[in-house]
């Protein structure tokens, strides 16, 4: 309602829309009736297809004036290499079985991380319903200091653990100081070992 009342743009980052684990279909905001001039969808080849380094994405809107401005900006900028554009376009020819297989694998990995985290006292988190990462509050005062300890001092048979302190994901200062972001992008055994190290 605020979008219409104040004539705002509603941006929707939909790069993970295929990676929802409950079986439900995620609706695109482009499907909202009456918001055609307000909705702007962002998509990315690198995230959708795990194509790290493919700096190709798109902006989608039914707002012709906005898209005209976007095209002017795009024409003034250098673009991605032609070969990368061709390769990225080919990725969109994959069938739904690709996303089903990737989704199933990420769900297995998520379930492994959740199962192992539940064994650790004092960790607080929500089980993600999509994407391939989760945020967790650790029973520490400062996740960044804990990360430095893990990298500089901790060693278990030559292994340690690296994660992303979550404070930088928040706009409000001092929020998420004891939180970490973990991406479950490695195999099951490595995930189990990582949770053991944590």
Where are these regions (language model features)?
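PLP-dependent class I/II
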Residues: 1-198
């Amino acid at each position: 309602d605020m979008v219409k009342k104040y004539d705002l743009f509603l941006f929707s980052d939909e790069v993970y829309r295929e990676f929802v684990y409950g079986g439900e279909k995620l609706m695109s905001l482009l499907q909202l009736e009456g918001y055609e001039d307000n909705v702007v969808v962002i998509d990315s080849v690198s995230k959708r297809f795990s194509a790290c380094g493919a700096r190709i994405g798109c902006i989608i809107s039914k707002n012709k004036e906005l898209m005209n401005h976007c095209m002017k900006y795009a024409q003034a900028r250098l673009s991605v290499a032609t070969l990368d554009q061709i390769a990225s376009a080919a990725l969109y020819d994959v069938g739904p079985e690709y996303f089903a297989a990737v989704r199933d694998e990420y769900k297995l990995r998520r379930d492994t991380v959740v199962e192992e985290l539940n064994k650790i006292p004092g960790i607080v988190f929500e089980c993600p319903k999509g994407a391939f990462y989760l945020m967790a509050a650790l029973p520490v005062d400062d996740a960044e200091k804990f990360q430095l300890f893990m990298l500089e001092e901790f060693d278990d048979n030559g292994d340690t653990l690296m994660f992303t302190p979550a404070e930088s994901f928040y706009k409000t200062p001092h929020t998420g100081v004891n939180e970490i972001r973990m991406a479950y992008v490695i195999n099951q055994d490595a995930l189990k070992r990582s949770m053991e190290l944590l």
